[in-house]
Amino acid sequence: MKRPILSLLAGLALTLAALPASAACPRIVSQSPYITLALEWMGLADCVVGVSRFDRREDLPRTGGVIDPDADTIAILDPQLMITSRWTAAAKWQAMAPAGTTTLRVDGFKGTADMEQALREIGRAAGVADIDARVDRFAADWRAAAAKVNGGRRRAVVMTACSGAPYSFGRGTTLYELFAHAGLDVVADHDGIRNFRPDGPPDELPKWLDSIKPEVIFALKNSRDEACNASLVRADTMIVPLDGDRFTHPGPRVLLGLEQLREALNP
């Protein structure tokens, strides 16, 4: 089954290769949706020739996931620049790069400064001449958007708890810092992300919430019809569902998330 697909990709690659090359538009493989969104924000949507299986760009060939990139497809696409997240092993990413291809691994999830740095690194690798000015404007914009939220220092936790295993965003994560900048007292008492595994103690999440006593739980959802985890429900806590797609892609999309947060807290 894979051979016909590879043949089609080979034909597509030949067609694309026949187009005039542009120094301002390198052929890019983006191995994570948040990287694709960053490239689009930089005006490089047409430079992307391959994306991961999780990307919303249905018009482009799929190049596997961050853990298991598809080396065969990437080779056929013959990119000039391959960008992935830190979840892809560095040696694996470098080994599957065609000769002469630049590889890059970025983060963006380890705080707001890290989010901005990831954008700078992507832009510099892609040859965006004004990337520093762009990121400086974005930094000012998200801070202004956060200031408008007026969180009132409410005790809060930020979780994805509406599908699968819940997890909380703690100190040192981009979401923790964004919500703190929005005037909320984020009371997660852990660093990084804390997972509440389905095979763990059944009362682990309720006990944790009882211990930190949040006034509001921001539950990031992937779709409008998801039902949030029943363990979140408590008499003295407000649950505010938010569109996870606006928050979990570090970069300019968080401006939409901060606007939704402002509207949710100031109806």
Language model features: what each stretch is:
Residues 36-41, 57-59, 164-170, 226-228, ...:
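Short, solvent-exposed loop/turn elements at domain surfaces
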Residues 23-27, 81, 91-167, 188-190, ...:
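Extracytoplasmic substrate-binding proteins
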Residues 32, 86-87, 108, 160-162, ...:
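Short secondary-structure boundary segments
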Residues 44, 98-101, 182, 233-237:
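Short, structured coil segments at secondary-structure junctions
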Residues 198, 221-232:
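Exported/periplasmic ABC-transporter solute-binding proteins
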Residues 175-188:
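Short helix-loop-beta junction
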Residues 26-87, 91, 184-187, 197-201, ...:
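A short, structured surface patch at a secondary-structure boundary
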Residues 2-40, 59-60, 71, 76, ...:
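Bacterial Sec-exported substrate-binding components of ABC uptake systems
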